[in-house]
Amino acid sequence: MNTEEIRNLLDELYQQKKNPDQVLREISRSTFEDLGFARVDHNRKQRKGFYEVIFCPGKTADQIYRIAAEMMDKKSDVLATRISEEKAAYVLEQIPQAHHNPAARTLSILSRKRTKKGRITIISAGTSDIPVAEEARETCDIMGNRTETIYDAGIAG
């Protein structure tokens, strides 16, 4: 919750448009949203520097979609990792603007365009490391960094 949103809530309380319990509920909701199967941490970016990441193994396609939709509702960037092709297809049907990288096993949604900063080089030793390197690249990209990749840089015995 940003300063303007807090100020608006206080104004509504002062003008008696909302009672103290309603204001407390909204403040509480701004921090975590309980979806029944997951608690979405909306203030993680303020505490840790980046939004919550959806780790997909063990979640259904609908659960991944519902978490992503909740995050989008709060104008958060969305990064889902280790997502299967089937689950990604389901989420893409619901959220066509999502970006899926099958090699990285990621699905991402940017809340807004941003200017990229810095440069991070991701180097993998062998071709079997490419999925992990691609996941790192997608993570760096959504965090607003320019990336460069060098694959299969290792030297086999």
Would you name each region that the model predicts?
Residues I54-F55, T81, S108-L110, I123:
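Residues in well-ordered beta-strands of folded domains
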Residues K48-Y51, K74-S76, I95-P96, A103-R105, ...:
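Short coil/turn connectors at secondary-structure junctions
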Residues L35-D41, A103-S111:
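Long, charged amphipathic helices and adjacent flexible linkers at domain junctions
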Residues L79-R82, H99-R105, I109, T149-Y151:
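General beta-strand structural signal in soluble alpha/beta enzymes
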Residues K117-G157:
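Glycine-rich phosphate/diphosphate-binding loop of Rossmann-like nucleotide-binding domains
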Residues K59, K113, G126:
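A broadly conserved detector of short glycine/acidic/proline-rich loop/turn motifs that flank catalytic sites
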Residues K87-A88, L107, A156-G157:
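Short secondary-structure capping/turn micro-motifs that flank functional sites
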